[in-house]
Amino acid sequence: AQTQATTLANDLVSLLHYARLQALHHQRAVTVCHLVDGQCQRPWQTSLTVFEDRAPLGSLENADQALLTINLPEDAKILWRSFRRKAYLRFTPLGGTDNQNGSFITCTRPGAIKTARKIVINRQGRFRVAQFDPEVLANRLGEKGG
């Protein structure tokens, strides 16, 4: 369980690095999210997509270009909480977030709160893995630690 949790967190960090570098390299806004029928949705599960995002934001339209899609493990879920409360994370052409400082909680399966990881991102687009209290997460999710 620990290995799966570490792998999921590392995969998310790698995907965020990729998205930020694409925004910087191509000088275009790039969005990361879980897409359902072309719209960014919560919670992030099943798959994540990185795409060049022109208006309207948070949706993959004809003018947008999908850059990468990764599949998540079957029971994995990524919770994204940000200042602007959007279902997506958007990197600007300068590599920062669109005023979306926040955090991700990665869970490999329901009830696996003790193996969850937290990744914090700031407005400049930099992120770090942080410590957190599993009991606080359990209260947020309405689950018992396990």
Each model region followed by its residue ranges:
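N-terminal helix-rich module
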Residues: 1-21, 25, 29-146
